[in-house]
Regions:
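Anionic-ligand anchoring segments at beta-strand to alpha-helix junctions in alpha/beta enzyme folds, i.e.
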Residues: 1-2, 10, 24-27, 112-161
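Generic recognition of flexible, low-complexity loop/linker segments
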Residues: 33, 104-107, 153-156
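Short acidic (Asp/Glu) and glycine-rich catalytic loops that position anionic groups and cofactors
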Residues: 46-51, 111-112, 159-163
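Amphipathic coiled-coil/heptad-repeat helices and related helical stalk/stem segments
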Residues: 14, 102-103, 151-152, 176
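Solvent-exposed alpha-helices and their adjacent loops that cap or buttress functional pockets
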Residues: 20-22, 36-39, 108-111, 157-160
């Protein structure tokens, strides 16, 4: 059984993989129930984000994370407090919006940087990859994401006083 994630449901690589593994059952999690991937799959789950207008596709990305968290909770049988966790995310977003001047200053530093690096460990690495992509899409600047464990094996040579490094740390006990 395979689970495929695609906001558009038209991703060429995703379609190619689905065709290759057509003998297996699959669930497609998408924002487009009329897509090719949905037609190729056995089951579909709509993230209900509606039409995405922004290039960075943040609304659909966040909706996909929520749907995946709900699915993981259901499949695992764990009684996690997903509702409270989602409320905490909303509160954090409100705090960012309430501190516009602080984040405006940080964003100006980021844009003025020669290059930007996101680092994260474990699941935070995947968030780093997405954050790097979002920054490329909206600011058109050079940015890369690395697993923090890989940092000393090459990428650290690129970091200088004109670099900006953002560490994504959401897991308790994480050592970068």
């Amino acid at each position: 059984f395979f689970i495929f994630l695609s906001q558009s449901g038209e991703t060429a690589d995703g379609i190619s993989v689905m065709k290759k593994f057509k003998n297996y059952s699959s669930l497609v999690i998408t924002n487009n129930l009329e897509s090719t991937m949905v037609r190729l799959g056995n089951f579909a789950l709509d993230i209900l984000a509606k039409k995405e207008v922004a290039v960075a596709s943040t609304k659909a990305y966040m909706a996909m994370i929520v749907v995946c968290a709900m699915l993981a909770r259901q499949v695992s049988g764990l009684n996690t407090n997903l509702k409270n966790n989602l409320k905490a995310v909303c509160i954090a977003i409100e705090e960012v919006l309430e501190n516009k001047e602080l984040f405006k200053g940080i964003s100006e530093e980021i844009v003025a940087s020669e290059n930007v690096f996101y680092i994260g460990r474990g699941i935070d690495y995947w968030t780093s990859l997405e954050a790097s992509l979002k920054l490329k899409e909206v600011a058109y600047i050079s940015t890369e994401a690395y697993s923090s464990g890989e940092l000393k094996h090459g990428p650290i040579a690129l970091i200088n006083d004109k670099s900006f490094v953002l560490a994504i740390i959401t897991q308790e006990g994480t050592n970068l």
